[in-house]
């Protein structure tokens, strides 16, 4: 969406009349309309009426003639035009006649005018179009019957549309029919012999993705699409988002899965199960088999775009490692035994009940998954509270965004972000703190880059030199490259400038915020120790840069902050979130389009798992378990008596397991061994349990310690909803039958029933209906509404029946905004002569979280191992070169990684990812955590790095344990084989 679709002034937006909201309302009219209108929609305050083929048609000013015609049901042939890209006018197929104008203008590049008279059909136009098509066909292979795009080819369709039945030009002259294919990319092929040089792929790479990896090389007849400097796609800057493939009107760029399986027969609109962007996708199917995944053009979170993971990395769903039958064993040293669902569920329930009989009601608990649906996480927390009879339930949000919930609820009154992703298109200043959107949230990252190319000014706060700092046609105005662990010192310095230089929005603060709290905060921020000069030595950021960034944020127009785990995963994570909220309130950057505070949540349903009451102290809707009135409402609905005391958090569960008071755990869709800090501590805790029940699709690192394995279902095998980082609730629709026979919600129902607490639901829609009855912010949510609108952002209730795109418009959820003192306290993780470097961790584009899904796809071609990034200065001091094996040691443990020497790092800081279990990234992270929420401090670990020649002791032990567990899994298969053979 271009900036012209938004009102860029600070006033007026938020009334419901701004262009961006009208756009949303227009698009919501039919969220499943897949028509390609040729050029993007335009929004204007006035309509223009024109005549097309004798019909009076009214459209917004600025609309192209092509779009006006197609919206009216008048077909105009086109090849270079598509409504996801700006008009280009190169194919000359969409020519029309306009009364009073000479020649035949291209309808895609011609805007409508009042009183204009247009003809789209005439003998002359038909002849011109046929001649254009003949020229295209004259240099195009005539292998339609065997072509992968047969039946889904715009060139083929347009040849029919213009009535082309024969070609006068032969293939005797020079042509491109023998040009070599590029098969280097694992997901799609490039066949230049079929290219018509329409530029759609190049424009998609530039406009939609913003990578600028493609170009048109040479001129005239020699023109061809080239990746970077004529490299193979796999060796180029291409990030395999698939935008070029989606844009291609021929078989020049085509998915290899389509070439292999043929054209899909039907499609199901669903929601991606990777990051927190929540892209709407179409699962294009042939029977029960996925042929391809394509971005849904009307998905409001992604607007027809996707990334390499959502677009292509879906093969894990049918990977050979999938476990589809329940398994049990007495001890973790025993071989697994495949059993029926009834036996597995009964075995798990009996062991849980025995534990509670021997060790008490609070000796067991559950962990929900941020990869499962809202309905499934709701059921797990309900099972724990009603069937287990305690509040020992937690979620992986504990180890990522729990400080977001605490910090935003304290200051603003709600545990969620304030904007839509689309509203970045009306931001004048964009601040990215502790996030790497181009890797972690790539579709939103592309939107952000587009807005920066349009003129928004970008501030990046990050220890690393991420792509946004200086990428293709995108450059940050300020990069505040702070030292890890000093976030709060820096945010206080920014606040100091805003307060002492008179940049506070006094009117906003007086009207919207608690005056006493603001006065106290203002005095705190103005203290000399919070000045940029005083904090420069702490954070490592020059005072002049801090002052310039603060001034830009406060005075540059609508300013939006987007932050990630680089904010939350710190000992002062909650403090930093509140510091960010302080900045937004002080400058009035809340409650309007293009401004706000937005956590970029990492997994597909982190927001939803929190919304559904997955924390030990909160019920669905973030209502405290200690509130008797709230408890009474749930007691009545659930026919039970809830306990008033908060239960154990995940770290507390581990500690209690090691001291013998916590003996059983139900873990759904979460690999805590690989993802939680201090792996040795986690593994020891799980090994001490009497019963660990894991529900997952693979035998992950946690499942290797399990006594019961309940096979899970992928997002393709279930119905439900996900809630993305912008509070958008979207439908997940089943595209194939669960390979195990049951969706995850059905398994939880069976376990609850076996425990003596029966829950009755025939479909996830009934679970959502119950959520709506019990949760005020979800009161208006239903599957019928989601099917009507496509998606909805909570709060959705009587006050906001179609959802709430922008939070805190007239007042904060808590009434008045609350400024909070954010005193900087140094991290307990300090560099010493023994551990002189700081390790910080994160993600990379091609992999996802612990990698269980992406490691089982071709994405390993881009990132097949975790590497340690280190600055040349630190590498030279240690005699380290790229590719060398290096030992990384902390006070918690040691592992060995391959080095990558890069100036993306600053001296004194090293970085790695955590996608591969054998890397042991969390062997070296420690127990240091956020003071308010226990969110681990993954971003600050003091380490030493040195060249080594062999794996670490932990890696050798891990390799042995993994081999033992896989052997026990194989024994299960070997033991069953004779019985199966005999049965046949």
Please tell me what each predicted stretch does:
Residues 4-5, 12-14, 18-38, 92-240, ...:
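Fe-S ferredoxin-like electron-transfer domains
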Residues 51, 114-120, 230, 474-482, ...:
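Short beta-alpha connecting loops at secondary-structure transitions
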